[in-house]
Amino acid sequence: MKKTIYPPTKKTIYPVILLALLLLVSCKSKKNMVASLPHPVLHTDSIYPDTTNAIAGLFAPDHSKLKALAVSKNKKQHTKKKETDTDADKSDRMLRGTQITSSSVDVSSVYTGVDRVVKYDFTHRDVPEAFEGFRIAFISDLHYKSLLKEKGLNDLVRLLIAQKADVLLMGGDYQEGCEYVKPLFSALARVKTPMGTYGVMGNNDYERCHDDIVNTMKHYGMRPLEHEVDTLRKDGQQIIIAGVRNPFDLGRNGVSPTLALSPKDFVILLVHTPDYIEDVSVANTDLALAGHTHGGQVRVFGVAPALNSHYGNRFITGLAYNTAKIPLIITNGIGTSKLPIRVGAPAEIIVITLHRLTE
């Protein structure tokens, strides 16, 4: 009797794909896990698995275990060189002026499309008194209509509204097709904040729909920043938001918009890829925000087959520093690319509360 062989269905193909990815990770893990990180990178003493979500949080770092870290604003990028004891002592003297603590809250049982809210308390001497307690919501890499669908988008909007942020910042890679631009930003426009909504473009947005995205954002009262800066004012004081245009085109955009700013201002740099703050000088920046990496999207024991960064795991997720010790927060983002799968890289939104350092 001849046996009939049926093609795999969607229900069976995803486990097969996931198994193949895990095998790929195991083949690459030795090389990735022994790679040394460039100096200086600050580490926490311990990293613990996030067990709040059995799938999305598998093997992911638990941000609630992060300890307070101290760094400083540095006005110049330094040429990479071999580390010496003198260099290390100099670096230690610079680690003051900023304190950063972090925690995370699992929301996957209440909201679809987002697994957790990661909260940072960012204390810095240049934060104006009027901005004490100022709340920043940061999202990136929605890739709308990949893993994130209409219900997830509506839940994301509800979650953002619940954060009661003073400003919403967005890191790019918004869509998986131009037909999704208007419904995406129409939904995000329901998030009302006192200081408005700002966004930069990601590589996907430059490949397609760029003008449509820019015009749609403006239509809904949002501000796209393409190598531009804007000033947020409150009670006679101010902070600066700077946005980078296509950070992959360094020939055109290799001069950071922060270079023309005053060192006295508190400056937040919004850029799609974290590599930019290491590739070029971003002097005068107090805090950089980036996405692009998806946190690895599929990570097992901290190792991912695709890192989306030239610097490996150094700029994969969470809190990091460039060589000039400028702090950078990298979000896992929300959507996915290539495959609608996340393992060990929970979809997240970031909420940062600013505090003024008093000595």
Please give the residue ranges for each predicted region:
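Bacterial N-terminal signal peptides
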Residues: P15-L24
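Acidic, histidine-bearing metal-coordination/catalytic regions of metal-dependent phosphoesterases
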Residues: C27-R135
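Extended active-site neighborhood of metal-dependent phosphoesterases/phosphodiesterases
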Residues: G97-T98, S104-S109, D121-T123, S186-L250, ...
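Membrane-embedded segments
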Residues: G113-D115, V127-N215, H219-R223
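Beta-strand-turn-beta hairpins that frame and shape the catalytic cleft
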Residues: D115, T123-A137, M222-R223, D230-G243, ...
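Active-site neighborhood of phospho(di)ester-bond hydrolases with catalytic His/Asp-centered motifs
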Residues: I139-S140, V167-D173, G196-N203, L225-E228, ...
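Short beta-strand/loop segments at the ligand-binding rim of alpha/beta enzyme cores
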Residues: P257-L270
